[in-house]
From Swiss-Prot:
Its EC number is 7.1.1.2. Core subunit of respiratory chain NADH dehydrogenase (Complex I) which is composed of 45 different subunits. It is found in: Mitochondrion inner membrane. Pfam families: Oxidored_q2 (PF00420). This is NADH-ubiquinone oxidoreductase chain 4L. PANTHER family: NADH-UBIQUINONE OXIDOREDUCTASE CHAIN 4L, NADH-UBIQUINONE OXIDOREDUCTASE SUBUNIT ND4L. It comes from Ochotona princeps. GO terms for molecular function: NADH dehydrogenase (ubiquinone) activity. It comes from the Eukaryota. Belongs to the complex I subunit 4L family.
Length: 98
C-alpha cells in the first residue's frame, strides 16, 4: 500500500469521525460527507488507474455525479431548514413531517 493510498484512507476515516462528532449540525455533517465523497473519488481514481481496465474509468465519474446530486439535495435541505426554523440543527428535521 502506497503512502498516497494510506493518506486518502486516513482522510476518509477523519471525515467519518467528523460525521459522528458533529452530527448535531447539518452544515458540518454535509461538509464531512463531502470530504468522504472526495476521498472516495480520489481512491477510486487511483484504483482504476492501477487496474488498467477501460470499463473501470467510468466509476469515478459516476461517483462524482452522485456526489454532486447529494450536495445539491443537502444544500436545498439546509436552506429549507434554516429559512423555516432559523437554525441548522438536525433534530429539527423531525419537524418537517406533514
Amino acid at each position: 500500500m502506497s503512502i498516497t493510498t494510506l493518506n486518502i484512507m486516513v482522510a476518509f476515516m477523519m471525515a467519518l469521525l467528523g460525521m459522528f462528532v458533529y452530527r448535531s449540525h447539518l452544515m458540518s455533517s454535509l461538509l464531512c460527507l463531502e470530504g468522504m465523497m472526495l476521498s472516495l473519488f480520489m481512491l477510486a481514481t487511483i484504483v482504476s488507474l492501477n487496474m488498467n481496465f477501460t470499463i473501470s474509468f467510468m466509476f469515478p465519474v459516476i461517483l462524482l455525479v452522485f456526489a454532486a446530486c447529494e450536495a445539491a439535495v443537502g444544500l436545498a435541505l439546509l436552506i429549507m431548514v434554516s429559512n423555516t426554523y432559523g437554525m441548522d440543527y438536525i433534530h429539527n428535521l423531525n419537524l418537517l413531517q406533514c
